[in-house]
């Protein structure tokens, strides 16, 4: 735990019921769960764990918690244990009930609202514990505090056992065990890697906090034979986070540049390091919550970075006259983490995608302006390496502009000429239209015949696509495999990307559910992530989910999109006759489906399954692409060996 964060906590304050403030009741959660956890899919299921862990991390931020343990138990129940102070158990004045009961049964009750319990905190608008309780079939909480162990039990938000003392202890902390409610969620299967990724992130963001995650399920879809457990603790905090992001890349400078500062109760820290790639990775957080759409803190960082490097370049003579480098130029090859912790965080959107506090733009900008300038003066070799790369990016940007002009003249793009392979739709309103980017000509043919041509366009991709890992915009523009995608979408790429010119508001990647299909998806996602990021930020990119199985009993036919769904449908079809003959056939590929099958299973808006791609998916794809397509052979070999038998479901 850094000294800056400790300084902003009033650590001497006793944490008791007087700091628990009640704002409103729990009624709405089960009626509209998506409002509180985003969705009732796998994403929402995992969000339950994050909410409980966020409460433990709040204790860490306050300087009281050093170790958090997350256990996936048999039956996909979850236990989260921390060694913090323990949730208060004394009577809360506003309600006359034990504070523990209030925290778990009243929405917006917690130590993060009054300002007395926590100065800074995460959690989805502070609703965590009660929402998890409302959406759990059952939940048990044990609090070790003041020499006693207190226990309370709930079911779907209602008390099944009043708070009582069940023993004595010399420990302190909170232990929560819950089982998600099958009435509320589409799936109950926890994915170890999803939880591991999030917990690793929390460990990086809270230097010195020890987080352990373990999987004690005897059998599960994603579990190898051996026991799974990971313990994470990073004394270097976000410095180590940057090194982790750059682990498969070649840094331009060995030292990670670290900057931090405070204003009142608010703190900000920034860590950055340049590498030899052409991509930019800026990951921002507010109160340990990832802000994938950025916000004021990220804006302040970008503005200061551009200004400082231009000023340094002019001062040292690298930049002549008005030949300034742009924001895109200075961010090429940059990996940066921006983390702020503030008392009154204002997030845009229910899921905290963007930070709205203007004060954070000023704080981060001031810190970077002063401390980065000082670092460059003290480390001129690093300054020169960064400026050389930015100037090279500037020249490449000019080359890309010329390449674009050449391509426009060559392809007639200016006159609106579309790619030969594109089978466009009749409607021209982007809000109503969608384009399927399809793997292979044969699948493209079936899709073209099976589509609804009023609003569905088809673009087949074929052959080997460009490795964008080592490609600048000028190379991308000239690539004959990606050019049709750029032209068909109509919005440009890179710094010229204009969302207003986008011709379709649904861009759907349709590829087989095999290794080749996964490769196509990964490559396209990486391309969109690096050259058309607003497309993903606005939620316009989707992945089609083709079915895996067709089940037939007589004239009745049904399709399944996963093994569990296949088993469920099989049981339903045999409900009246356990010995009924049911034929199960596996779809081998999109190209093997006839147009009618493709329409019914994958393209009909009333029956298809589409998965919206998030920035987190794209970041993961980008990381994997760096390993698989980069020049470093060893990480690629390790990745393939580790995943050959247990293929990780990227859900992309």
What are these regions (language model features)?
Residues 17-31:
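Mature N-terminal segment immediately following signal peptide/propeptide cleavage
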Residues 58-59, 86-87, 515-516:
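Residues immediately C-terminal
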Residues 395-414, 429-434, 445, 449-451, ...:
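C-terminal interaction appendages of subunits in large macromolecular complexes
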């Amino acid at each position: 735990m850094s000294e800056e964060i400790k300084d902003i906590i009033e650590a001497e304050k006793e944490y008791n019921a007087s700091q628990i403030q009640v704002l409103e009741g729990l009624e709405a959660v089960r009626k509209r769960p998506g409002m509180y956890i985003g969705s009732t899919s796998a994403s929402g299921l995992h969000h339950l764990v994050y909410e409980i862990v966020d409460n433990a991390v709040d204790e860490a931020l306050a300087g009281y918690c050093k170790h958090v343990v997350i256990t996936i138990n048999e039956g996909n129940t979850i236990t989260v244990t921390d060694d913090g102070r323990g949730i208060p158990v004394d009577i809360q004045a506003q309600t006359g009930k034990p504070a523990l009961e209030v925290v778990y049964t009243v929405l917006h009750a917690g130590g993060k609202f009054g300002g007395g319990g926590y100065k800074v905190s995460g959690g989805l608008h502070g609703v965590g514990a009660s929402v998890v309780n409302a959406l759990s079939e059952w939940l048990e909480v044990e609090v070790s505090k003041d020499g006693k162990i207190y226990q309370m039990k709930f079911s779907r938000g209602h008390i099944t056992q009043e708070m009582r003392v069940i023993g004595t202890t010399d420990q302190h902390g909170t232990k929560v065990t819950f089982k998600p409610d099958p009435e509320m969620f589409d799936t109950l299967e926890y994915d170890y890697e999803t939880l591991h990724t999030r917990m690793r992130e929390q460990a990086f963001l809270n230097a010195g906090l020890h987080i352990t995650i373990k999987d004690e399920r005897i059998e599960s879809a994603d579990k190898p034979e051996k026991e799974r457990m990971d313990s994470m603790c990073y004394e270097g905090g976000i410095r180590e986070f940057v090194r982790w992001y750059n682990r498969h890349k070649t840094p331009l400078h060995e030292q990670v540049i670290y900057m931090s500062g405070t204003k009142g109760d608010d703190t900000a820290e920034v860590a950055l390091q340049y590498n030899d790639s052409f991509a930019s990775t800026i990951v921002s957080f507010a109160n340990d919550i990832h802000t994938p759409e950025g916000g004021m803190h990220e804006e302040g960082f970008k503005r200061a970075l551009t200004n400082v490097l231009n000023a340094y370049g002019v001062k040292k003579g690298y930049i002549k006259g008005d030949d300034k480098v742009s924001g895109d130029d200075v961010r090429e090859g940059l990996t940066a983490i921006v983390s702020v912790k503030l008392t009154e965080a204002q997030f845009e959107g229910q899921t905290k995608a963007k930070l709205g506090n203007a004060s954070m733009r000023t704080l981060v900008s001031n810190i970077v302006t002063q401390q980065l300038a000082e670092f460059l003066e003290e480390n001129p070799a690093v300054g020169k390496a960064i400026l050389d790369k930015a100037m090279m990016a500037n020249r490449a940007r000019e080359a890309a502009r010329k390449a674009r002009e050449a391509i426009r003249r060559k392809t007639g793009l200016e006159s609106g000429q579309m790619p030969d392979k594109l089978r466009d739709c009749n409607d021209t309103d982007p809000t109503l239209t969608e384009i399927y980017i399809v793997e292979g000509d044969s699948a493209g043919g079936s899709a073209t015949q099976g589509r609804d041509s009023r609003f569905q366009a088809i673009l087949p991709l074929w052959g080997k696509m460009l490795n964008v890992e080592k490609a600048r915009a000028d190379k991308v523009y000239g690539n004959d495999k990606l050019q049709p995608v750029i032209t068909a979408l109509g919005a440009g790429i890179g710094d010229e990307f204009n969302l207003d010119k986008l011709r379709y508001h649904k861009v759907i990647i349709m590829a087989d559910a095999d290794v080749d299909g996964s490769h196509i998806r990964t490559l396209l996602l990486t391309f969109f992530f690096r050259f058309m990021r607003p497309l993903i930020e606005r939620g316009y990119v989707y992945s089609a989910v083709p079915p895996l199985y067709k089940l037939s009993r007589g004239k009745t036919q049904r399709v399944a999109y996963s093994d569990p769904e296949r088993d469920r449908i099989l049981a339903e079809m045999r409900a009246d006759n356990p010995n009924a003959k049911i034929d199960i056939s596996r779809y081998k590929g999109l190209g093997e489906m006839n147009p009618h099958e493709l329409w019914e299973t994958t393209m009909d808006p009333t029956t298809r399954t589409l998965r919206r791609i998030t920035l987190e998916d794209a970041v993961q794809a980008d990381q994997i692409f760096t390993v698989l397509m980069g020049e470093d052979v060893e990480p690629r070999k390790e990745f393939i060996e580790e995943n050959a038998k247990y293929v990780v479901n990227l859900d992309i």
